[in-house]
């Protein structure tokens, strides 16, 4: 390093000199060699001639303020003697540096800087750090301060600081800026490089960008894309310089030094040429320039001036390209210009010729410029090209190029004046020929367009599309609309040559013109409508104001009246305010025919526009609504009209386009049939029954009156029917109506029961002709025909109906019982009658709910017939009804005098319905009706009502399932006597099984249920009772044979099963098991347990379970009436115990459940649920549960079918020991497995339970199989009441003792339970809560 200058300590001048030098030094990289000292350190300058080194002495002459003052000490006097405290303050965060730094490379000797640094021991928190640049700076400042104590020293210091800052920023930003400029220029030289020239989005048509002189800039600076012709002005160097100067001057506060630097830089730039700056300015222009309208003189001058720089840049760029090995033709805008040049052959030969010349007179001048490897050639070519550019008419050139560019074309009318000219000139070379066979008028208009296009060649695009030209184009478009798309496309391609835009743009313009014309057509109608509205509005506004005034006056009067209660009054006002948002009358526009007609005319025209739209992005409705919102609605004062009202008022015009096919429920098909059937049967017995049907569903008294008036053949049957009907009508029926809980849509549970009864009657009529069924019809009140009927109808429509079969199978007094819900004859005792009425009512109500139509018109005789059939079926399938059947041997064998008899009759009725295809349909209809009542449940799906109404159809439906079940039925020859029995046996080996099956699949195999109906109805209790009916009412079974031929009954049980499935929640399955094997149950309270296990198998296995029961059923049937009778007594017990038994799954009721699930393949899911429920011992619980919680499915049992089976099991044992509990019998045989009748409720509890009645709720001790009380989801209270009632009814002496403590159980149900208790003394079912 050169000998550092020595600092004179004494004289100030040297210091200043040094200071100045130092300033320079600072500019230079630090050259001073700092010498760190552990003690106060000093950097001693190399001894200068006149310098006296301070020889390591800490104290130095104060004057020797060598710059080494510790950075901290910015004091004027150097604190050398005592090194300043840690230089930390001065230290900028640079890494700790022991003040020693490598000396920068030696430079012209400058004064040495002596630094005194105090090194302190580092601590955990801090350590000494030094920044060499800062130390130098600080030292220099201190030196200045020390040496110059005059006030001017501050100025010097400030100036130095400013200068340092300026230099710092220059170093930081200046260089990069220059580099950036260069890079940008290079990037912009070949804008298109690397892009796909075929991409229509890339606009390479404006190649002149690269050739725009650097001296030109846009008028206001900046970039413009597709904005039409650009205005250029000469870029002034001074402006640029001034701008840069300003930038540089802003940071520094001392302009002098800055100016010097800047001036030097400027000179440099100027020497190098303003190439960088100008190209840079050119670049902005290039990005957005579309056309040049600048002065030619300026262009020429600049071109000449910048030719060298441009050529050099091109050369450099070419080298870079070669290095990248990209030989693709440069996509420099120049090339597009060349291509566009050929376009204007006529417009400007100058352009056409100039461009090739511009490119160095070579065939493809652009390529040589960039591709040529010879730098000298490149340079000359570029220079020549630039010179030629000076002679170009850039306006024309750019216009021509913009014509060819897709972007400029899409730019549409904004732009390039000469575009049309060049386009028209260029295209003719490749003008596609017009398609052949064009209309003469169209060809003439196209010729007119050609001529007009030539006139506008020199005008440019904006002037091209004049009104006349638009008219020609529109005329052509209108004619083309009548031609095919191929011809249209050919014409458009031809026209493209004559218009300053491409084909796509032309098509868009033509469509727009067409739509505009359509819009013009709207003006007049709109104006007329506006005028009409303005004429009408004043009057309406006046009325509105009057109304507002009247309201405000009324309000004021009220406020005054309430003045004494100011607070209350104010509160009231506040309360009123929200509702008073209207603050007065609503602004409701009153339409008149004139305005409506005007609106319709307007909409018609608008629809015409819509149809003209080629691509209908909107639907007609949205299109019209948006039009009304934006165009029509504003014609009214604000707030007086809404687009939806306009749409509504004009619907007559646009309805064909905007009306969506309404989705209407098509449910009523079956329902009407049911009604017809009922009507047909009604003629036989038309009296209060019909009235009842018509009467509100919930009219409890109607059924009784109907029965009274309609009591016809089979007095006992009729009576029982009446009682049942009345009971069903009574609140009990409603209470039991599961509809109320589950089926929200169905509002009249009683009516549902009535409908079921009616359906049963219809079935009976179909089987036997009019009979007591009419009475049953009477009890069945017609439920509200609203949703229920529709649902029923839909369900019915789904089911195959076989009315003829129902009609064929004769049913005696039982039909009425069946309708009422009892298959057995009218109970001999008034008590029995009442019970029977209750049970039948329940059943009727349950079934009626779904089959509203069919039940109401059925004649009493038909009902009786249906009852007889079902009682027969019951007798054969389940002997639950035997006891009451015996009591009522012939006509009312199934209709139990007591609730037990009623249960038995219900079962019998159910059985009949299931057995007899007609009865089955009818009965299923009731069940379905019940289900439909609880439409929520799958049961409703079966649509009992349709079945009832169309007994024949129902029969068919049941037949189908029946046939399916018949195979099972075949296994049990006993059932063979009755077609339904075979079904039952298919469903279950024995009638009892059939009953269970019904419980499980009431709908699927109604015939099964028909003869097992009692068990089905009163799941396990009925099983117990079933044996009784098997003994006594088996004669009914004999009638059932006629039914048995009717597989439709079985099919009907399928329907029932479906319904049950629907109302899976219902524990109806519990009932099914009981009725399933009346004989078996009677014989075996315990053997019901075995059955129950069978039932316990899968619900699908119900058939197999029922198989044993079915076999028993044959025996029951064989035993005939006596069995039925005996079964009846146990039936009740079975009902009670079936709940528990079901849980055990021991009763034959299980088989019943099995048939239910099996029989109800349609409702297999529901049946399965029932089966599970039965398994859990939900038989009785099922019965109870519907009462307490119609919506709740049996918790214990997975499905109502299971419940039924469990009940059946319990019922089987009960049947053996107790009088039949037929409460659930027919009524319980709900088409829906979910709706499976409560095993204990029997006829009393309608099978129409939207939910499964958990048998678990009812805990009944069964004689054979201890009733397993499954935990019932239903309310415990209901369960208790039901169990108590069931137990009492099952017990022989407690006919009346069994009073349901809970309202959910209708009185008639309670009575039925009591009757069952009387008849059945062996009921040993302890009541179990859930």
Curated annotation (Swiss-Prot):
**Compositional bias (Basic and acidic residues):** 16-31, 55-67, 560-570, 1321-1330
Its GO biological process annotations read: chromatin organization
Cross-link Glycyl lysine isopeptide (Lys-Gly) (interchain with G-Cter in SUMO2), sequence positions: 258
What GO CC terms are in its UniProt record?
Answer: nucleus
Renumbered to this chain, the Pro residues biased-composition regions fall at 81-96, 1030-1044
Q: Which residues carry this modification: Phosphothreonine?
A: 229, 238
Residues modified as N6-acetyllysine: 1052, 1132
The Phosphoserine modification is found at 13, 236, 297, 402, 405, 408, 570, 1107
Which residue intervals make up region (Disordered)?
Answer: 1-113, 236-304, 322-345, 559-583, 767-789, 801-835, 866-909, 964-991, 1021-1202, 1292-1330
Keywords (alphabetical) are: Acetylation, Isopeptide bond, Phosphoprotein, Ubl conjugation
Amino acid composition bias (Low complexity), ranges on this chain: 866-895, 1045-1056
**Family of the protein in this entry:** Belongs to the ubinuclein family.
Protein's UniProt name: Ubinuclein-2
From the UniProt record, report the name of the gene that encodes this protein.
Ubn2
């Amino acid at each position: 390093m050169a000998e550092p200058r020595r600092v004179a300590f004494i004289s100030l001048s040297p210091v200043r000199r040094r200071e100045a030098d130092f300033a320079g030094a600072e500019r230079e990289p630090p050259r001073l060699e700092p010498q760190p000292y552990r003690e106060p350190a000093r950097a001693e300058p190399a001894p200068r001639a006149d310098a006296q080194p301070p020889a390591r002495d800490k104290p130095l002459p104060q004057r020797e303020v060598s710059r080494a003052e510790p950075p901290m000490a910015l004091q004027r006097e150097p604190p050398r003697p005592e090194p300043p405290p840690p230089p930390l303050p001065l230290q900028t965060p640079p890494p700790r540096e022991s003040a020693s730094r490598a000396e920068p490379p030696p430079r012209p000797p400058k004064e040495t800087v002596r630094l005194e640094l105090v090194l302190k021991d580092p601590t955990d928190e801090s350590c000494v750090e030094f920044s060499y640049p800062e130390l130098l700076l600080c030292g220099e400042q201190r030196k200045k301060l020390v040496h110059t104590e005059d006030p001017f020293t501050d100025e010097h210091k400030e100036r130095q600081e400013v200068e340092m800052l300026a230099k710092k920023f220059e170093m930081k930003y200046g260089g990069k800026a220059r580099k950036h400029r260069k890079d940008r220029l290079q990037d912009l030289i070949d804008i298109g490089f690397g892009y796909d020239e075929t991409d229509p989005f890339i606009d390479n048509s404006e190649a002149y960008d690269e050739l725009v002189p650097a001296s030109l800039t846009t008028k206001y600076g900046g970039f413009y894309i597709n904005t039409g012709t650009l205005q250029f002005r000469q870029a002034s160097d001074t402006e640029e310089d001034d701008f840069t100067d300003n930038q540089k001057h802003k940071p520094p506060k001392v302009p002098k030094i800055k100016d010097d630097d800047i001036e030097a830089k400027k000179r440099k730039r100027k020497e190098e040429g303003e190439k960088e700056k100008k190209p840079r300015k050119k670049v902005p222009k290039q990005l957005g320039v579309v056309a040049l309208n600048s002065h030619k003189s300026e262009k020429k001058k600049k071109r000449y001036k910048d030719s060298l720089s441009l050529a050099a840049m091109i050369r450099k760029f070419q080298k870079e390209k070669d290095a990248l090995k990209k030989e693709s033709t440069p996509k420099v805008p120049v090339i597009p210009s060349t291509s566009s040049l050929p376009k204007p052959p006529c417009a400007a030969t100058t352009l056409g010729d100039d461009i090739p010349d511009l490119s160095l007179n070579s065939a493809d001048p652009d390529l040589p410029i960039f591709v040529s490897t010879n730098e000298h050639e490149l340079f000359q070519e570029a220079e020549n090209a630039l010179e030629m550019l000076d002679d170009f008419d850039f306006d024309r050139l750019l216009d021509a190029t913009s014509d060819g560019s897709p972007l400029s074309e899409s730019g549409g009318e904004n732009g390039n004046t000469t575009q049309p000219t060049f386009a028209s000139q260029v295209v003719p070379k490749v003008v596609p020929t017009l398609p052949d066979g064009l209309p003469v008028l169209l060809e003439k208009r196209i010729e007119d367009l050609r001529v007009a296009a030539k006139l506008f060649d020199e005008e440019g695009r904006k002037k091209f599309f004049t009104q006349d030209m638009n008219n020609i184009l529109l005329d052509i478009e209108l004619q083309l609309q009548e031609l095919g798309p191929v011809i249209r496309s050919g014409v458009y391609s031809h026209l493209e040559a004559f218009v300053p835009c491409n084909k796509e743009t032309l098509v868009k313009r033509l469509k727009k013109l067409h739509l505009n014309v359509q819009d013009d057509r709207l003006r007049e109608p709109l104006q007329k409508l506006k005028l009409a509205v303005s004429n009408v509005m004043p009057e309406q506004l006046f009325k509105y104001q009057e109304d507002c005034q009247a309201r405000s006056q009324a309000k004021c009067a009220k406020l005054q009246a309430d003045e004494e209660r100011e607070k209350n009054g104010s509160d009231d006002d506040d309360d009123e305010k929200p509702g008073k948002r209207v603050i007065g009358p609503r602004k409701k526009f009153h339409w008149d025919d004139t305005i409506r007609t005007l609106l319709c005319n307007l909409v018609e025209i608008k629809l015409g526009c819509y149809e003209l739209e080629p691509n209908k992005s909107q639907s007609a409705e949205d299109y019209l609504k948006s039009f009304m919102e934006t165009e029509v609605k504003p014609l009214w004062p604000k707030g007086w009209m809404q687009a939806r009202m306009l749409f509504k008022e004009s619907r007559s015009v646009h309805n064909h386009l905007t009306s969506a096919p309404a989705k209407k429920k098509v449910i009523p098909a079956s329902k009407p049939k049911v009604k017809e059937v009922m009507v047909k049967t009604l003629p036989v017995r038309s009296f209060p029954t019909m009235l009842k049907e018509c009467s509100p569903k919930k009219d409890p008294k109607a059924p009784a009156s109907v029965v009274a008036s309609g009591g016809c053949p089979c007095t006992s049957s009729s009576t029982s029917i009446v009682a049942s009907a009345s009971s069903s009508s009574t609140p009990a029926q409603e209470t039991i109506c599961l509809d109320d809980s589950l089926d929200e849509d169905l509002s009249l549970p009683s009516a549902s029961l009535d409908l079921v009864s009616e359906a049963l009657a219809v079935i009976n009529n179909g089987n036997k002709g009019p009979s007591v069924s009419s009475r049953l019809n009477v009890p069945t009140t017609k439920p509200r025909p609203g949703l229920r009927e529709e649902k029923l109808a839909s369900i019915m429509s789904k089911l195959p109906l076989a009315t003829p079969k129902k009609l064929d199978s004769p049913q005696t007094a039982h039909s009425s019982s069946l309708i009422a819900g009892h298959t057995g004859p009218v109970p001999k005792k008034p008590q029995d009658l009442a019970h029977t009425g209750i049970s039948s009512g329940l059943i009727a109500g349950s079934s009626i709910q779904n089959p509203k139509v069919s039940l109401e018109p059925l004649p009493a005789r038909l009902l009786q017939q249906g009852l007889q059939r079902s009682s027969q079926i019951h007798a054969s399938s389940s002997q639950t009804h035997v006891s009451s059947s015996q009591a009522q041997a012939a006509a009312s064998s199934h209709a139990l005098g007591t609730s037990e008899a009623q249960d038995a009759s219900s079962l019998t009725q159910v059985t009949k319905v299931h057995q007899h295809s007609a009865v089955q349909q009818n009965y299923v209809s009731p069940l379905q009706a019940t289900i439909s009542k609880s439409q929520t449940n799958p049961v409703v799906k079966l649509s009992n009502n349709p079945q009832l109404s169309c007994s024949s159809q129902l029969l068919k439906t049941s037949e189908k399932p029946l046939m399916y079940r018949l195979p099972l039925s075949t296994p049990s020859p006993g059932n063979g006597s009755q077609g339904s029995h075979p079904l039952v046996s298919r469903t279950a080996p024995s009638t009892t099984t059939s009953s269970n099956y019904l419980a499980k699949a009431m709908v699927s195999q109604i015939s099964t249920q028909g003869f097992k109906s009692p068990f089905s109805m009163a799941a396990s209790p009925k099983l117990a009772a079933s044996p009784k009916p098997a003994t006594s009412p088996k004669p009914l079974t004999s009638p059932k044979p006629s039914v048995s031929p009717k597989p439709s009954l079985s099919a009907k049980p399928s329907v029932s099963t479906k319904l049950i499935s629907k109302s899976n929640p219902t524990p109806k399955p519990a009932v099914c098991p009981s009725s399933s094997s009346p004989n078996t149950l009677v014989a075996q309270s315990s053997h019901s347990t075995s059955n129950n296990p069978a039932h316990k198998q899968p619900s699908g296995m119900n058939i197999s379970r029922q198989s044993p029961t079915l076999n028993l059923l044959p025996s029951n049937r064989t035993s005939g009436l006596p069995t039925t009778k005996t079964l009846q007594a146990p039936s009740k017990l079975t009902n009670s115990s079936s709940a528990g038994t079901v849980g055990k799954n021991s009763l034959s009721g299980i088989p019943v459940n099995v048939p239910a699930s099996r029989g109800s393949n349609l409702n297999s899911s529901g049946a399965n649920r029932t089966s599970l429920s039965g398994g859990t011992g939900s038989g009785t619980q099922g019965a109870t549960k519907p009462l307490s919680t119609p919506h709740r499915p049996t918790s214990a049992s997975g499905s109502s079918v299971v419940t039924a089976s469990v009940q059946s099991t319990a019922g089987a044992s009960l049947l053996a020991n107790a009088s039949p509990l037929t409460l659930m019998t027919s009524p319980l045989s709900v088409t829906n497995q979910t709706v499976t009748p409560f095993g204990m409720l029997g006829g009393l509890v309608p099978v129409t339970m939207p939910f499964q009645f958990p048998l678990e709720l009812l805990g009944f001790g069964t004689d054979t199989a201890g009733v397993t009380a499954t935990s019932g989801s239903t309310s415990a209270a209901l369960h208790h009441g039901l169990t108590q009632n069931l137990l009492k009814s099952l017990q022989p002496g407690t006919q009346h003792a069994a009073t349901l403590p809970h309202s959910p159980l209708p009185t008639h149900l309670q009575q039925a339970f009591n009757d069952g208790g009387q008849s059945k003394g062996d009921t040993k079912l302890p009541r179990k809560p859930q």
